[in-house]
Amino acid sequence: MSVQVQFRVNGKSYQSHVEPRLLLAHYLRDTLGLTGTHIGCETSICGACTVLLDGKAVKACTVLAVQASGSEVTTIEGLAATASPNGGLHPVQEGFWEKHGLQCGFCTPGMILASVELLGKSPNPTEMEIRQALSGNLCRCTGYQHIVEAVQHAAKEMKNRKPKSKNPNNSSAKR
């Protein structure tokens, strides 16, 4: 038995017939070839398989492809394209690069996508908010401090990149 699913993955539409119990992580990796969605524990503990599902960070090893049908999925492969059509990195990816927020890289895609969700909700998070938001993503290498610094760096970059208001009635404008 197969079920039809349809998604927008990294801005591109896909339609497939899948087995009803196929996990989103396996659909992304095996059907679409998007291997940046890592498989670590397959029990929702490590967070290596984190993707954005309609903008919310989810662990793709616990979401069935049929549950995600009709949704917009963003993987690590598509993140830069959403931020910079000319091939540049997303500010969170830049932060991980600049602040050495990765070592072996296995947890990195999940950490980055969980961080993107956090910064979408809280553009200026505290260190504790960052640690809490990433508590479902495990890293065996970095000790987390560089990851926290990477997210803080990204928050500053994202704030600096926002266009300034051109409204002359803006109360913060000099008079």
Language model regions located:
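Signature of N-terminal electron-transfer/Fe-S-associated modules in redox systems
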Residues: 1-166, 173-175
